[in-house]
Amino acid sequence: MAKSPSNNAAQRVRKKVRKNVADGIAHVHASFNNTIITITDRQGNALSWASSGGQGFKGSRKSTPFAAQVASEVAGRAAIEQGIKNLDVEIKGPGPGRESSVRALGALGIRINSIADVTPVPHNGCRPQKRRRI
């Protein structure tokens, strides 16, 4: 005989843990196709994250500076709820959302201590892909 669904599944849902962290790091990964913003504490534990695609932008609109700005605002508001007041920003990648995402974080009232470019640069490592011809 089949059992009826119980309310145990509803009871197992965890409440969001509200951390009280004042300082953090904003990791901005700006590729040519998307922009992903992750806000962590000093140890690297993620507090909030957002991406351009996750905010409803699809296709070529994901890679616009406006989409990066919207994603930064969403991640920044969630981080402010966790208690973030100061951020160090680490930008990785060559995408168009680099600058607008940092400006959006500053406009939210978060104090930006430093901005660092941590784009990985090969010391002549792997052979690059062939040139794209259109």
From Swiss-Prot:
Q: Which Pfam families does the entry link to?
A: Ribosomal_S11
The keyword Ion transport appears for this protein = no
Listed GO MF terms = rRNA binding; structural constituent of ribosome
User: In the UniProt record, which is one GO cellular component term?
Assistant: ribosome
What does this chain do? Located on the platform of the 30S subunit, it bridges several disparate RNA helices of the 16S rRNA. Forms part of the Shine-Dalgarno cleft in the 70S ribosome.
Q: Which PANTHER family match?
A: 40S RIBOSOMAL PROTEIN S14/30S RIBOSOMAL PROTEIN S11 (PTHR11759)
The protein, known as: Small ribosomal subunit protein uS11
Q: Which organism is it from?
A: Polaromonas sp. (strain JS666 / ATCC BAA-500)
